[in-house]
UniProtKB/Swiss-Prot annotation:
Record's function text: Required for the formation of a threonylcarbamoyl group on adenosine at position 37 (t(6)A37) in tRNAs that read codons beginning with adenine. Is involved in the transfer of the threonylcarbamoyl moiety of threonylcarbamoyl-AMP (TC-AMP) to the N6 group of A37, together with TsaE and TsaB. TsaD likely plays a direct catalytic role in this reaction.
BP terms from Gene Ontology: tRNA threonylcarbamoyladenosine modification
UniProt xrefs under PANTHER family: TRNA N6-ADENOSINE THREONYLCARBAMOYLTRANSFERASE, TRNA N6-ADENOSINE THREONYLCARBAMOYLTRANSFERASE, MITOCHONDRIAL
Species: Rhizobium johnstonii (strain DSM 114642 / LMG 32736 / 3841)
Gene that this polypeptide is encoded by: tsaD
Protein name: tRNA N6-adenosine threonylcarbamoyltransferase
Taxonomic lineage of the native organism: Bacteria, Pseudomonadati, Pseudomonadota, Alphaproteobacteria, Hyphomicrobiales
Pfam family, one: TsaD
EC number, as in UniProt: 2.3.1.234
Length: 365
């Protein structure tokens, strides 16, 4: 039987500095003792996006205090944790270095094993923490750096069914917002404006819709937004709202096609065994209510459970990193050596082809 385990998690892959203490009991149930996150939004908003050097320096300044706070809120010391889990990639290399080196130092000083965690694996396994989900299931990761449809077979067993061939969806939202003069971060700004817009005013393209492969493309949609804005300039507030609403509609229809095909493939490869299949959504874009509604309706139509973890666990956090470490420990996986290095590009499926897409938040994996 797997023993009771407790891990300190560290996350620094992009623009959130985070630390958490999480437990896993012998039956696989989770208990989050602490969850501390410091956003760098104010540091980057003036630049309209994440500046890697600023992000790395902010991690250096904040991480030690956040770890102390996480331990304090959990009412434990380093002696009370069984291991350290730190994000090792993919992401911005400067931030990864800060978090992983800190994790190494703590592991060495406290005599604890170190688990270097793939950030994407943290997202992939979160639904097991929040909903006790059984394998296999599908996960849609939609963030500023990634847009991927992943089959989750088990801990360490992932198969990428679809990925972006250019911009990630969160990146497309941010760039659209910037084109329209909206504030950073762009996703929430576009969603707010879209509420008062006419989604049928502009017929924006829906890239790759109808194709058998499950990949995504959003750069053409971004270009269409730019052209529409130029054609009707100067823009009124209503123009901006209509563009945002039409953009969101195009994204929703694209996801409906791409994910719908993925759900059908899943049902073909994994015939019903009595338990309802599940689609999990994660990443910052998962906060968008229209996109959630589209995915919920799609799952209802296809007989799937739609699982969206709480928003604070959809975006970058250390709880998911600690949980991924706990899941690995529970399988008997060996810890990493202290010479493990961060990886800016680190696909979950090791046999995947190398991608050429490169997002503003780091290499796409």
């Amino acid at each position: 039987m797997v023993p009771f385990l407790r891990i300190l998690g560290i996350e620094t892959s992009c623009d959130e500095t985070a630390a958490a203490v999480v437990e896993r009991d012998a039956e696989g149930h989770s208990n989050v003792l602490s969850d501390v996150v410091l956003s760098q939004l104010d540091e980057h908003s003036a630049y309209g996006g994440v500046v890697p050097e600023i992000a790395a320096r902010a991690h250096v300044e904040a991480l030690d205090e956040l770890i102390e706070e996480a331990l304090k809120r959990a009412n434990v010391s380093l002696n009370d944790v069984d291991a350290i889990a730190a994000t090792s990639g993919p992401g911005l290399i400067g931030g990864l270095l800060v978090g992983l080196m800190t994790g190494k130092a703590i592991a060495r000083a406290a005599g604890k094993p170190l688990y270097a965690i793939n950030h994407l694996e943290g997202h992939a396994l979160t639904a097991r923490l929040t909903d006790g989900l059984s394998f296999p299931y599908l996960m849609l990761l939609v963030s500023g750096g990634h847009t991927q449809l992943i089959l989750v077979r088990g801990v360490g067993q992932y198969e990428r069914w679809g990925t972006t061939i250019d911009d990630a969806l969160g990146e497309a939202f941010d760039k659209t917002a910037k084109l329209l003069g909206l504030p950073y971060p762009g996703g929430p700004a576009v969603e707010r404006m879209a509420r008062d817009g006419n989604p049928d005013r502009f017929d924006f393209p829906r890239p790759l819709v109808g194709e058998a492969r499950l990949d995504f493309s959003f750069s053409g949609l971004k270009t269409a937004v730019r052209q529409a804005a130029q054609d009707i300039a100067p823009l009124s507030d209503q123009d901006v709202a209509d563009i945002c609403a039409s953009f969101q509609k195009a994204v929703s229809r694209t996801l409906k096609d791409r994910i719908g095909r993925g759900l059908q493939r899943f049902k073909t490869e994994f015939p019903a065994t009595g338990e309802k299949p599940a689609l999990v959504v994660a990443g910052g874009v998962a906060a968008n209510l229209e996109l959630r509604g589209t995915l919920q309706a799609l799952c209802n139509k296809n007989g799937f459970r739609f699982i969206a973890p709480p928003l604070h666990l959809c975006t970058d956090n250390a709880v998911m990193i600690a949980w991924a470490g706990l899941e690995r420990m529970a399988t008997g996986a060996a810890p990493d050596t202290l010479d493990v290095q961060p990886r800016s590009r680190w696909p979950l499926d090791s046999n995947a082809e190398t991608l050429i897409g490169f997002g503003k938040r780091g290499a796409k994996a």
